[in-house]
Structure formats: structure tokens, C-alpha cells
A protein has these predicted regions:
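Walker A/P-loop phosphate-binding motif and the immediately C-terminal alpha-helix
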Residues: 3-41
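Residue-level preference for the first positions of well-ordered beta-strands
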Residues: 4, 33-35, 99-101, 133-135, ...
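C-terminal alpha-helix
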Residues: 246-256
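N-terminal phosphate/diphosphate-binding loop that engages ATP/GTP or pyrophosphate donors
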Residues: 28-97
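Conserved catalytic-core segment of NTP-binding enzymes
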Residues: 115-217, 226
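C-terminal boundary of histidine-terminating zinc-finger modules
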Residues: 230-241
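Cytosolic-facing regulatory segments adjacent to core modules
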Residues: 81-136
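Short, hinge-like loop/turn segments at secondary-structure boundaries
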Residues: 51-55, 176-177, 204-208, 233-235
Length: 256
């Protein structure tokens, strides 16, 4: 069975960037194929990886829901909605050389995400035996944790920036996992965008207050910002990038 790694944290702390670089590290070190899952309704892991999915699970939901009502969405005659869904799910996985990407995406209007969340859960369970590693970029906050979407995760990586709010958000996610009796083999914190790669006393104190294990820090790097501004996939950062080097050391520590 594949090892499930869940990456979570407050919005805006760079968790998706680190998630993409983690996928890259695993692929470059012979841990492929990796199944990358963008479980954030505000999907952008594909941009970090430089991949364009054919269809997201959210779009697939809309296609199924509106079939027979909206002329743009038609299910072939003689096929049930469930059978059509199963047939189309393979189109929701973008295949690359060393990894595949599945994107949750958003639904239109006021539609509930329960169906799409359920698809994420069932697909991860179904595909787990086909990949040595499954890396899930979770929605900002605690949505998938609270709904039990990923009870099978083995490693929970919490990401924060240097702010107290970011660390506190990571602490709340860790506490919620404990309350829901989720028992990853490893749970720890990565602090991202750290000036000069050194944490100040206030941030270290907050990490201790939250009872979090610090896996490591990733330094601030203007090159990441520039790549983002230029629309370049972050995984194209040079190998000697401080961000890639720091994350690589953290992954080695995790024994992945």
C-alpha cells in the first residue's frame, strides 16, 4: 500500500509550494510513481507542477449533476450516471512521467462539496495500492481533517510561516487530529519563508506552546516569488536553490 503524506496549514504560508517540491524530491529519488492530490477547492498545485488537468473532480460533479438538464452536459444513452462517473474518473488524473495528478477543484454555485470530498476519499483508497507515495495538498485550515477525508494518512506535515497565527493554526490542526483519533506515524511542523533561515525566539516559543515537533525550516527565497510572478512552475527551481536544499534535508530526516 502507498504511503499517504498529507500537507496542511493556514492559507498563504506556502504549503502548496512545499507540497510540489516534496513530490519532485520523491520522484528524483526513485520513489515514483507518486500520486499528487490537490484536495484544495482553490486548486493551484497544478501550477506549481506545471501541469494542466483535463478535468477536475468538481467539474466532473457538475457534469454529472447537470446531465439531462443542461444541453452542454450529456450522458450517452444506456449508461447510468454511476457508470459514466466511473468511466470519466480516469480523465480526472493527469499523467506525467514520474507522477500523476488528481485535482479536486471547485463546484459552481452553492453546491455542497460533500460529493467531491467523497470522491477524493474513495479515489485515494482505490488507488493507494498503485503508488508507493500519495501526497495530498489539503485545503487551507481543517476541512479534510474534520470530515475524516484522510484517515489513512501516515505522515502529517503541518506548514506555517514565522507568524504566531500560522503556528497556532498548525497547532489547532494537530489537536483536531488527536481529538478525532487520527494517529499518523509522524506529525511535524515545517516553518516556511524564514528570513535568513533562522527562527526568532517568539516563533520558537509559540511552537513549544503548541506542542509541535519542529521538522525544520525553509528559508525565504526571492527566486520563489519571482518564479510565481513569471508564471514558471516552482519545480523548475535550480537544484542548488536554498528552498529545495532545505526541504530535501527535512525529507531525509523524515526517512521518506
Amino acid at each position: 500500500m502507498g504511503h499517504v503524506i498529507a500537507v496542511s496549514g493556514k492559507g498563504g504560508v506556502g504549503k502548496t509550494t512545499l507540497c510540489g517540491l516534496l513530490i519532485q524530491y520523491l520522484c528524483e529519488n526513485g520513489k515514483h510513481p507518486v500520486l499528487a492530490v490537490d484536495a484544495d477547492a482553490n486548486a493551484n498545485l497544478n501550477e506549481v507542477l506545471g501541469v494542466k488537468p483535463e478535468i477536475t473532480l468538481g467539474e466532473l460533479r457538475e457534469e454529472i449533476e447537470r446531465a439531462g438538464v443542461d444541453p452542454r452536459y450529456q450522458i450517452p444513452t444506456g449508461i447510468t450516471k454511476q457508470a459514466y462517473l466511473e468511466m470519466r474518473l480516469s480523465d480526472a488524473i493527469a499523467e506525467e512521467d514520474d507522477y500523476d495528478l488528481m485535482v479536486m477543484g471547485r463546484t459552481q454555485g452553492q453546491g455542497c462539496y460533500c460529493f467531491v470530498n467523497g470522491l477524493v476519499q474513495t479515489q485515494v483508497q482505490k488507488l493507494q495500492s498503485h503508488y508507493p507515495y500519495i501526497v495530498v495538498d489539503n485545503e487551507a485550515g481543517m476541512e479534510h481533517i474534520s470530515r475524516g477525508i484522510l484517515p489513512m494518512m501516515e505522515v502529517a506535515i503541518l506548514v506555517s510561516d514565522c507568524s504566531r497565527r500560522g503556528v497556532q493554526a498548525a497547532g489547532r490542526i494537530a489537536k483536531l487530529m488527536n481529538e478525532l483519533n487520527f494517529k499518523p506515524q509522524k506529525t511535524g511542523l515545517i516553518v516556511n519563508r524564514v528570513p535568513d533561515g533562522k527562527l526568532d525566539a517568539g516563533t520558537l516559543e509559540e511552537i513549544r506552546n503548541q506542542g509541535l515537533e519542529l521538522l525544520g525550516v525553509v528559508p525565504h527565497d526571492d527566486q520563489v516569488y519571482q518564479y510565481d510572478c513569471d508564471g514558471k512552475p516552482i519545480i523548475r527551481l535550480p537544484k542548488d536553490s536554498p528552498v529545495r536544499s532545505a526541504l530535501g534535508e527535512i525529507v531525509k530526516k523524515l526517512g521518506l
